[in-house]
Amino acid sequence: MAKDYYAILGVDRNASQDDIKKAFRELAKKYHPDANPGNKEAEEKFKEIAEAYEVLSDPQKRKQYDETGTTDFNAGSGFNWQDFTHFDDINDIFNQFFGGNFGDTFFGGYTNQPDLDIYLRVNISLEDAYYGASKNVKYRRNAMCEHCSGTGAENKVLITCPTCHGSGQERITRGQGFFRMVTVTECRTCHGRGKIPQKPCTVCHGTGTVSKNEDISVNIPKGADTNLKLRLKNMGNSYGGVTGDLYIVLIVNNPPGIRRSGQDIYVEHTIDFPEAALGGEEEIKLFRESYNLKIPAGTQPGEILKIKGAGMPRINGHGSGDLNVIIKIEVPKHLTSRQKELLEEFRNEKKKSWFHF
């Protein structure tokens, strides 16, 4: 007994092609095996729906079915997935049903999205970071061709790619039935753009870009630290009329004897032991700056004395960190007779005194 394909799709015999396609898409959403994992009944129903659509969506097959009530499927060995010619419709259903580009992802899709941004690592000194600076940076990039405005076309006229018909992708199908694996690759003709130049640009030869050497000045903000990224818009590579950005990634190099922690700076400073005991005042230099630091009496080795607000400027412009001075005490290796005499006197006096340092 011949199958009633119209009843299977739920349409009348005078249904238009749009009505038939709409009915198929709705039923395919409902019964597709990937939406009903492990459901054999849904799997058979989906196969039946696909068979009905294969016949009714083809004018010649539909005419034969309407006139005789039979098709090659009825007379032969039955419907086979190798006979199905509408896998694009099923892929469209995946995209609508699951959202976005699910079909491409599910079937092993690939979309060419070139990374147009350029990242350059630039070394600067801690002094440059302290005061701010301007650095010259040289690099090479693929810039937009000004002759064709990045279109790749001599007359800026683009036509639909004849290979991918504007999709920018080519599909390679492997396997059978709804277990087919569809691999989506970049179109080899238009390189994913979907369009090609009507006549290639005489300057860039159809690529839309030209290689360009850049020599730019980059402003280093006060307080910059390692791994800070400075973004320069539209100074990256170009592709398809779109230009990426240039990111300058800073590496701040500390000079010997100076350490940075956040916005605080640590330096070592050596004093003699009489000053450590009696106290005094020392001049502390940092780059082009000079500070007077009071040394309290009884200062110990390794003690940290703080100069408020003399550290790295905060990059947001609100204040600065601190300059932390790590005290080292120098013990002389060679003494004069008088110095030895005074120290012996000091030691003896200390033994007699109740006060101990």
Swiss-Prot record:
Binds 2 Zn(2+) ions per monomer. Keywords: Chaperone, Cytoplasm, DNA replication, Metal-binding, Repeat, Stress response, Zinc, Zinc-finger. It is found in: Cytoplasm. Zn(2+) 1 binds at residues 145, 148, 201, 204. Gene3D superfamilies: DnaJ domain, Heat shock protein DnaJ, cysteine-rich domain, Urease metallochaperone UreE, N-terminal domain. The keyword rRNA processing does not apply. Homodimer. This is Chaperone protein DnaJ. It comes from Picrophilus torridus (strain ATCC 700027 / DSM 9790 / JCM 10055 / NBRC 100828 / KAW 2/3).
